[in-house]
């Protein structure tokens, strides 16, 4: 197996044992990108010169036995809505084409402190609005398992690059499923941490009460290792939580005998296809075989998650994206003759169709006369959804179900049908609305397209999610299939 498919844990071991130099790892990754990414189209920008320079500096530290950092010499890819100082950050939008940040995001500072090596920026749905990575202004990423299928979204580039062996880990952002859904479609592991667990400073805002940064990897333990490096309270983000326990790996490998797991009947109901239901039922049998107690429960407000989410997220987006006016930064229309025209033309030309749709929806929901009927009512529904989870977690440790109602759909199949596209978020949006942690791991395949299993945990209990996900992974994984993609 090529180095490109090795895990974060294995690469770290090889580097620390001096079996390989960081520069050799990074070169192998760029060779893989050159060979594979013209087809996959996961990267928007590469930072090869700086990456090789840093890797060679790490070679020198390796020679001196000064290998500090949990991710020493490990290559990484970063979703293009996470600010990277000195490297173009576009959010896959014409609006930010050519924008080079002059400061660093908190997560990037943390990863640099761990001596990880930035390979490049990854494709996404424009401003993280979409579920297929087809709304990107620049290119359409494909699914490494089936090039006629979407990789999911909005972190489609982040998921595809990891599945294709182009980076051992990546970061994405999850507002309504944007890490977990592409992880499910691409057969990898994706974690949306508890809201506030990871600083959002330097994440270009979509919906500020929902957005969270998280890792995507090819196995569960790697995911826990990466998450440990990026969590923590941040003075630059007032919503970051002062939680002391940032250890996610110590329970990995412990059995799950006696663990109580809830399976909501709504998660296997209308809209979920038969192959997905069968894969989840098989997964439940595996969990029971490991000694877990799985029981059916009800989360009665699940069906209201999508309408509630799209009102709240679009309302927050209409506010957050008002800063892109063509004056201070962002696309500047050359056709405008007046200030009013400058605002209108810069935004209408700079934003894509889906972004404009959500800005319009959010502006309408917040407008006088409709605020109570839409936005306020959606916030009440959000409270009911959170209370549903609270009731279940009084008696259960974890909730399990499918990540998505179906496997990956075909490229071009749903891009012009927004309601069908939004329906794919049925099982992921409630987790964001409740601010809970959720992880997606592979649990099956149909017609070569992976199916994802989602575990949902109590607030700030990512450790338990990793424990149960790891135990399941030992019985079912796609590790040997990645190299055949």
Swiss-Prot record:
Heterotrimer of A, B and C subunits. The active site is at 79 (charge relay system), 154 (charge relay system), 178 (acyl-ester intermediate). Keywords: ATP-binding, Ligase, Nucleotide-binding, Protein biosynthesis. One of its GO terms (biological process) is translation. Its EC number is 6.3.5.7. GO terms for molecular function: ATP binding; glutaminyl-tRNA synthase (glutamine-hydrolyzing) activity. The keyword Acyltransferase does not apply. It comes from Staphylococcus carnosus (strain TM300). Pfam families: Amidase (PF01425). It catalyses: L-glutamyl-tRNA(Gln) + L-glutamine + ATP + H2O = L-glutaminyl-tRNA(Gln) + L-glutamate + ADP + phosphate + H(+). Allows the formation of correctly charged Gln-tRNA(Gln) through the transamidation of misacylated Glu-tRNA(Gln) in organisms which lack glutaminyl-tRNA synthetase. The reaction takes place in the presence of glutamine and ATP through an activated gamma-phospho-Glu-tRNA(Gln). Belongs to the amidase family. GatA subfamily. This is Glutamyl-tRNA(Gln) amidotransferase subunit A.
